[in-house]
């Protein structure tokens, strides 16, 4: 439960107790609920910040402590890495999903701060995909159409994202930066979030003629 700070703080110690040690954390789980300027509220922002910003920071903090404990116990080579999944929309703004976007922007900034604070034992890298998976808000046909909106003919795939995360975890020279793995989809200007474009088009087509 990422809304429960005690549960979040207890997660990594439970993993370590089961597996013995841990080298990396990939923060990929995210809350993604729609709001905009008209419906924005303290409650919506706080909910997203807890899940999408505070939880990844606490897990990075816990990994750093675990690596420090290993080093203190004699593991001179103890190192760790954190990968935070972000979103290309941070570089291609639209007014939808305001609280989600703010929470991801805060996580991107936190990545830079953590890269400085947790060095040299723990590296922190962001990975920002484009439209990768469909949702209940998009038909298969609409997803295929939107996925093709990229200078390279398609957006990222799960395999693209996984390969980039693996690269970030293995390359010891990368920290404090974000790898955009969106096939430059961020360069395609859109007026609304991809996940809503199908629904909005449908509502427009079904609207009665005045």
Can you name each region flagged by the protein language model?
Residues 28-34, 184:
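Conserved NAD(P)H cofactor-binding loop of Rossmann-fold oxidoreductase domains
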Residues 36-49, 146:
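Substrate-binding pocket helix/loop in short-chain dehydrogenase/reductase
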Residues 1-5:
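Rossmann-fold cofactor-recognition segment
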Residues 60-61, 112:
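A short, exposed helix-loop element centered on a Lys and neighboring polar residues
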Residues 21-23, 108, 117-132, 174-181:
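Conserved Rossmann-fold SDR core element
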Residues 159-181, 186-187, 192-193:
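C-terminal substrate-recognition "lid" of short-chain dehydrogenase/reductases
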Residues 68-106, 111-119, 131:
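Catalytic loop of short-chain dehydrogenase/reductase
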């Amino acid at each position: 439960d990422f809304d429960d700070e005690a549960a979040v703080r207890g997660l990594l110690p439970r993993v370590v107790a089961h597996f013995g040690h841990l080298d990396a954390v990939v923060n990929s789980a995210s809350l993604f609920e729609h709001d905009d300027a008209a419906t924005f509220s303290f409650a919506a922002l706080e909910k997203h910040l807890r899940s999408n910003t505070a939880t990844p920071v606490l897990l990075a903090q816990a990994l750093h402590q675990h690596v420090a404990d290993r080093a203190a116990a004699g593991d001179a080579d103890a190192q760790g890495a954190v990968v935070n999944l972000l979103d290309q929309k941070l570089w291609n703004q639209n007014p939808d999903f305001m609280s989600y976007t703010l929470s991801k922007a805060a996580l991107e900034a936190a990545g830079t701060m953590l890269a400085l604070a947790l060095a040299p034992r723990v590296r922190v890298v962001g990975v920002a995909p484009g439209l990768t998976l469909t949702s209940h808000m998009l038909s298969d046909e609409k997803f295929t159409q939107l996925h093709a909106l990229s200078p390279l003919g398609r957006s990222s795939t799960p395999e693209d994202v996984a390969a980039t995360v693996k690269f970030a975890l293995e390359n010891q020279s990368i920290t404090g930066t974000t790898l955009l793995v969106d096939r430059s989809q961020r360069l395609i200007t859109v007026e609304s979030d991809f996940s809503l474009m199908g629904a909005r088009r449908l509502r427009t087509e079904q609207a009665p003629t005045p």
